[in-house]
Each structure stands twice: as C-alpha cells, then as structure tokens.
Amino acid sequence: MLDVNKKILMTGATSFVGTHLLHSLIKEGYSIIALKRPITEPTIINTLIEWLNIQDIEKICQSSMNIHAIVHIATDYGRNRTPISEQYKCNVLLPTRLLELMPALKTKFFISTDSFFGKYEKHYGYMRSYMASKRHFVELSKIYVEEHPDVCFINLRLEHVYGERDKAGKIIPYVIKKMKNNEDIDCTIARQKRDFIYIDDVVSAYLKILKEGFNAGHYDVEVGTGKSIELKEVFEIIKKETHSSSKINYGAVAMRDDEIMESHANTSFLTRLGWSAEFSIEKGVKKMLSMKE
C-alpha cells in the first residue's frame, strides 16, 4: 500500500478509462482530486476522492497540499459533432492550464493520455480536428518542458482499449451485443489491424508509470500488447465465444479511403520497466463475457 499522502489530480475520471483507473488508485491508497464538468455527476463516492468542478481548479492552488502527479485523461473526440472550439478547450486549453499550474500545485509530474490516432505517421480524415488538437498540445508540452527542465512529462499513447463498461457504440461492445442477440452484422472487409489492449492492462500501465521514478524530460510512451490483429479475426473470436448464429456480412460497408490499416504499440519503454500486457484478445473477450451487464 502506498503512502496515502500521495495525491493525484485527475481529469476524465468519469470516462471509461478514468473510472477503471480511479477504482485502482483507491485500492492502491492514493487520494484523488477528480476534476469534472459542472453538469457531470460523480461516478464513485469514496473518502479518498474529492470531486471538484473544473472552473474551481484555482482553489487547489490556494491550499497547502502537494500534488504527486497530474493525470490528464479527459478527451473530446468530436464524434458527436462537437464544435472545434469545444474540442480545443478540452484537448488543448485545459491541459495547458494544468501545465501552467504545476508550480502552484507543487508537482513536477504530468501524465497525459493520447491515442494511436495521434501518431504523426497516421492520417485519418474522420478525426482530423481531434488529431490536430491532441498533436498541438503535445507540441506545447514539449515547449513547456524545455522552459521547465525539472518537469517530467509523459505522453501515454493508448492503442485500441476495450473492456467491460465501455460505451455501447464502441466496436467490441457493439459486436458482442449483436452476437448475443444473434443479429446479422454489416461491416467492411475487416482487414484493418489493431492492437487491442484490455482495460486492466491499460490501468496497470498507468500504475506502473506512477510508481516509477523518472528523470525530468519529455517521454512518449506507447501502451498496447505490441501485436496487431485483424478485425475479422476478432469478430470470429467473439462469434465463437458467444456461440452466436449471427451472419457477418464482410464487405457490406465500404472502407474509408484514408482508413488506418495497421497500428501496434512499441512497448519497449514499458518493457524496460518490467510491464507487459497479461490479456490476449481471447482472454479479454472471455472476461468481458463473464461480467454481469
């Protein structure tokens, strides 16, 4: 158990990844200040969690508490036609403000959450504004670290995360639901390859990073299994595990012209820390199916 005085300032605590991480941080004995939007209700009530509206962030600076690390998870993908200005607030202005508050918060450790969409060699028109905003913040964070050489900034780039309690519209929960109901599925040829990383492994990567001591600097850390697998193979695994009679209509949906056809994590950084993913896609799907809905 860690020293309970280790306090984490966290954004995105009500998100899929954030909620899972929050549970584990509590188990590890961390205390958490969870920033949220005024209209968002807390997802977990615990004595180790203090929920705080984002606009009240300055109040923390007025206190005498020391923050061990800032963990930024809040993200706006722009999937629901969110105005670009709103995406910019969440993906650039909020984390940049947190960077600027680091001296007042008495912390020199910042962990930011990114995704494989943001890799500079990837181009995906469907999420251009999201990718542009995330890349903008990464560049700003590099400038900040150059100007504050005692700061440790880690950009955690997550591959395709999946697991229980994820949004129903995400590909794995969506296919599982369809398969359970024996409903036919229309999809592309499903030759895209993704590095599917189970949520428990993602959380363990965050915890590993939090517990390690790093030299000051700017780090880009990729989180995944290190191996990619075709969507078609994943669909067939789910069909087998659910004993479904669903028909999968491969090629019924046209592929996007700029589809990212392959992505996998370079796990060398985390491997050097002694971390490795425990869940294969088969093991992860089985665990999801074993959980109560």
Swiss-Prot record:
One biological process term in Gene Ontology: O antigen biosynthetic process
GO terms, molecular function: oxidoreductase activity
Pathway(s) the chain acts in: Bacterial outer membrane biogenesis; LPS O-antigen biosynthesis
Residues of the active site: Y130
InterPro entries recorded: Epimerase_deHydtase (IPR001509), NAD(P)-bd_dom_sf (IPR036291)
Positions bound to substrate: T113
Keywords carried by this UniProt record: Lipopolysaccharide biosynthesis, NADP, Oxidoreductase
EC number: 1.1.1.341
EC category: oxidoreductase
Reaction(s) catalysed (UniProt annotation): CDP-alpha-D-abequose + NADP(+) = CDP-4-dehydro-3,6-dideoxy-alpha-D-glucose + NADPH + H(+)
UniProt superkingdom: Bacteria
Protein family according to the UniProt entry: Belongs to the NAD(P)-dependent epimerase/dehydratase family.
Protein name, entry field: CDP-abequose synthase
UniProt source species: Salmonella muenchen
